Amino acid sequence: YLAAKSSLTQAQFHRQGVGAGSTLVAALQHGTVVCGMTTQPTVSALETQKIAYSAIDLATTDGADKWLGGAFPSAAVLANADWVNANKDTVQKVVDALVATMHYIATHSAADIADHLPPNFVSNGLVTKDLYVKALDQDKGQFLPDGMMPANGPDTVLAVEKLAGKVTAPVDLTKTYTNDFVVAANKLEGFAQ
């Protein structure tokens, strides 16, 4: 999408999967790739080690608005509609846990969150705990406190997919997602008015 938006053709670049974390760091250090797309804490590790810098921010609301035209929901509970309809109790339990997690993230500091994660996740060969906390604090805004689909999210995703050539037929966005389970989870958890 970003290439198409900048009028680059697929003949002008190629994609290569190198993973995230230490494998992306190594790929950049050894010239296997010259540009990468990743998330925190890899971004902070790359910047701190002066291996790379953030050219495009897609992790914040402002960055998504600037580069994608609006909110771009990327973390979700994804399942086939037939399975969802046949397993509503299970789906509700998963969404309840996700909403409780989003609320926890919104109401706790990055340091509090890091204290409850596995030690080797927040402090390892790639990042220190302090760097992890700093990165999480910087990017906490990408986690929506109520877990609801952002109002313009589906439209943004569709526009991106169309420009990237992934969607060529009409799409009824109302059939692609539901907030029903999220609304119920917020009520159950006591987060809804």
Please provide the spans of the model-predicted regions.
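A short, structure-level motif marking secondary-structure boundaries and short turns
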Residues: 9-10, 27-29, 141-144
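Ligand-binding cleft/hinge of the Venus flytrap
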Residues: 1-17, 45-50
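Short coil/loop linkers at secondary-structure junctions
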Residues: 8-9, 52, 123-127, 167-168, ...
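Residue-level marker of alpha-helix boundaries and capping positions
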Residues: 14-15, 33-34, 148
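Conserved C-terminal helix/tail region of periplasmic/extracytoplasmic solute-binding proteins
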Residues: 155-193
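Pocket-lining segment of extracytoplasmic ligand-binding domains
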Residues: 23-121
